[in-house]
Amino acid sequence: MLCQFSFKNFKSYKDETVFDMQAANLPEFAENIIYCKPASNLLPVAAIYGPNGGGKTNMLQALTCLISTVVKPIYDMEKTRTKLIVQQKVSCTPFLFDEKTSNEPTEFLLYFRTNGYEYRYYLSMLHDEIIAEALDRKKIGGKRTAHVFDREEKVITLGSSINKASINRDVNPKMPYLSFLAINYDIPAINDAQKWFESCIIRSYANTEAELQIMLSDNKTIRRQIISALNDMGIDINGYRYDNDSKQLIMQRTLHGKTYELSYKDESDGTKKLIAALPILLIALAEGRLAVIDELDAKLHPKLLRYIIALFKNPKLNTHGAQLIFTSHDIATMKNTVYRRDEIWFAAEGDNHSSELYSLYEIRKENNERINNTAAYDKQYLEGRYGADPYLQNMLKDGEWQ
């Protein structure tokens, strides 16, 4: 599970930016968080809003960049330990609107939990070369942190959990040492960290191959869940198959006792989007994975988006700590009946063309009080009260077109 992610000098983000999935002490939806006693509780969902060009996608790309940098060398060497589902490579690009930062490293810091431990992974990159890297871990709820390894350019130090005598410290400057160790050695702490990175789902709607593989697999439970979820959302499908001749996914419906078939390509855009998204979301729920999806709401009715959010926020369905992080323009879903205040995030362009990221929970009113959990989040957002100025406020001021 993802606890916290921070990064600096990546694309539109110049300064250190922190994205936190640790649940704040809030009264609303207390029953829907992921309880992790004795450690801090975590959020199952986070939605990022903001204007086009504000930095929503770049925030997800920062996380994707870190994950793919670790996973790609392992995948290329066919040493993966977990089935990859739609991971994509994102290059490491610094903030370019400043002569200084354009030649400085990009930094990432990630806290995540897996297999009874909380890990801290740090990576500093200058374009595609590793400048510094470190991995530490401690037992969940524990106080003592164990050093796994530390890397400062060519100098690598190993912690007590690694048999130093048998470990090669000569590594390609473009390869993370975490990836190098995962490829060449069998080290429990490295294996656990590697499996977590590989389990992350990074969604690209340009590629539906992974979804087809899941839908057409022999896993009867997943097939049944996909059909059941589609039915729950008002899409009356009772089966599907793949036609090898036409290379098309065929959706099956029964009407008055007769089965009719319709090609996937002939379904509505919203139905196609939902069919494409559901398999990976159900896999994430079943296996406790992190799913990262850009513009999840595109072409989806708000009711369908709320259904997907509710799947992850339901502790009876989300029994393995699955998490969903996505960007959205769907203001109709920005409601106090859908989200906690710490589950809503905003990305907006600040000074010097640099993006800023903050949660609704962090915002203070003029009297220094937080936004109330009974507030009309969507209305106040459109009024520009949350700082991530939506286009409506910029176009219309004092009742006049600007």
Where are these regions (language model features)?
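Short, hydrophobic/aromatic-rich segments at coil-to-beta transitions
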Residues: 1-4, 102-110, 131
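Phosphate-binding glycine-rich loops of NTP-binding sites
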Residues: 41-91, 274-275, 280, 310-311
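Pre-Walker A-like glycine/lysine-rich segment at the N-terminus of P-loop NTPase domains
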Residues: 2-68
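C-terminal lobe/lid and adjacent interdomain/linker elements of RecA-like ASCE P-loop ATPase modules
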Residues: 1-4, 255, 310-402
